[in-house]
Amino acid sequence: MQYHEQFDVIVVGGGHAGTEAATAAARMGLNTLLLTHNIDTLGHMSCNPAIGGIGKGHLVKEVDALGGIMARATDLAGIQFRTLNSSKGPAVRATRAQADRLLYKAVVRQMLENYPNLKIFQQACDDLIMDGDRVAGVVTQSGIRISGKTVVLTVGTFLNGLIHIGMENYKGGRAGDPPSIALAQRLREMPLRIDRLKTGTPPRIDARSVDLSVMQAQYGDDPRPVFSFIGDASQHPRQVPCYVTHTNERTHDVIRNNLDRSPMYAGVIEGIGPRYCPSIEDKITRFADKTAHQIFVEPEGLTTHELYPNGISTSLPFDVQVQIVRSIRGFENAHITRPGYAIEYDFFDPRDLKANMESKYIGNLFFAGQINGTTGYEEAAAQGLMAGLNAGLRAQDKDPWHPRRDQAYMGVMIDDLSTLGTREPYRMFTSRAEYRLLLREDNADLRLTAIGRELGLVDDERWGKFNIKMEQVELERQRMRSTWIHPQHPSLEAVNALVNTPLTREQNLEELLRRPEVTYDALMAIEGVGPALSDHAAADQVEIQIKYAGYIERQYDEVEKQLRNENTLLPLDMNYRDVNGLSNEVIAKLNDAKPETIGQASRISGITPAAISILLVHLKKHGLLRKTA
């Protein structure tokens, strides 16, 4: 049966990657279909009810700067907001929000159902329609054939998903949802490298059975940070605290005594789990010297009693989970509402993707999210936006676009995945970026919104607010350069009280703000110096640009040097055995990875600077020197 309409972009899967992919394509004015096995689970938070964190918050801000929905949904559903690393430099400060799980899902669904150019259809995807070596649509579980110029796969943990609780296991995409078996089998028939990964989740607990009074309360920040560049704290619902408790030696003894009943340690689970979000079994084994591990007790929402004990993800049998939970301070009488579990699933080697998220081997087919070996809502959302954007560009026969490593954490992640691949669930950290000072949360809009506008991702409302902010920043910087404090200034005494070294010569406000001990707010509070900008985001931007100007300039110089050969193209059909002077090891690695550019090649383990020089000589000699735009 043929579906009555053809689409420019078909997105398979309605999680965090799929919703961003579908809305990105729709914002570009393209006829877009979001295909999901269950409309009621659109935007569902399968794991912890939180958005952001170090590295992750940066990705959310970048998604928002390009018009994405995650930050706005979080502002409407966030029940606790904090800035992490607030005492450190601006490069590593990160926003994190606790979200009401049900409210977040409802907000996302409402956004999707009212999105221009976007249709939603409830059917599982079982097959792809092929036209030679290109995809031309999808086939649903009930045999409906839907034609599309491009297809984006954002299927999360559903491909051959296998859920483990102790020695028992059953097929599932996540708890309560069926797996995708037919599509997984179809993809295994294609020329794609495939492997298995694992992730897990803790048991959920009824708050009425917990003694929160013996735990440490953790409140949100005041004033509250806002996630979206066009958001406001007034949008936030009622705010609530989280709580902190710890495991203890009794907890650890229970786990050690039951490791033989763990599917991970009994060899039942083959997939590799996330290094930076390990199960409690892993923690006890890997950090045997630790007598306690922190547990963040997170409310699931404002209308439920369920708690999410972040830090005790487990796949041990249910009876052991009860013992573990009840050994923890405050949980002595805890009632578990849902058992914890581990899930194994198929993922595809992201080295088989171009930097625009398109398969190197199957034209018009794009991948985003956990199918690429990543973990986390934020990583999925960022990939989804890039895949949806580039699927939209492909549908219009336009050139692809992706950010470089110096432009966005998105660029860092995509380059890491497509160049180096991953053997374990990939998670974003600020430490993965070489140019952290350029890739701050606060300047994500400065870096990306103008580009997003050109690509058709940024609407008039966001563009207007962005330009107002930019004008405020520029005018304030001009004012600070042209406002001078001289030794006879009536406010000299107040200025000298602010600085470590009193003024002996005339200085403008910009010079004063460069001093480490001076803040923008304190300087503006001096009579005759202000008024301060009323927009706190614009004021922060002024302060950071002035205080860190020298460091920022140095990073731009480093970027300029690095870019000289970064974008030199390497033909995808190039046989590196034909390049004289390369070692067998280098030839094997380059033929395996098939890098798109010299920059990608240079980041492959074992590819030496000498090998890069040989490649450049070969390209020049054969008239193959080309650069990306």
Curated annotation (Swiss-Prot):
Family annotation (PROSITE patterns): GIDA_1 (PS01280), GIDA_2 (PS01281)
Binding positions (NAD(+)): 273-287
A GO BP entry: tRNA methylation
SUPFAM superfamilies: FAD/NAD(P)-binding domain
Pfam short name (any one): GIDA
Subcellular location: Cytoplasm
Principal cellular location given in the protein's record: cytoplasm
Keywords (A to Z) from UniProt: Cytoplasm, FAD, Flavoprotein, NAD, tRNA processing
GO cellular component terms given for this protein: cytosol
Gene3D superfamilies, per the entry: FAD/NAD(P)-binding domain, GidA associated domain, C-terminal subdomain, tRNA uridine 5-carboxymethylaminomethyl modification enzyme MnmG/GidA
Entry superkingdom: Bacteria
Cofactor entry: FAD
Record InterPro entries: FAD/NAD-bd_sf, GIDA_C_N, MnmG, MnmG-rel, MnmG-rel_CS, MnmG_C, MnmG_C_subdom, MnmG_C_subdom_sf
Record GO terms (molecular function): flavin adenine dinucleotide binding
Family membership: Belongs to the MnmG family.
Function: NAD-binding protein involved in the addition of a carboxymethylaminomethyl (cmnm) group at the wobble position (U34) of certain tRNAs, forming tRNA-cmnm(5)s(2)U34.
HAMAP family named in the record: MnmG_GidA (MF_00129)
Protein name: tRNA uridine 5-carboxymethylaminomethyl modification enzyme MnmG
Native source species: Aeromonas salmonicida (strain A449)
Gene: mnmG
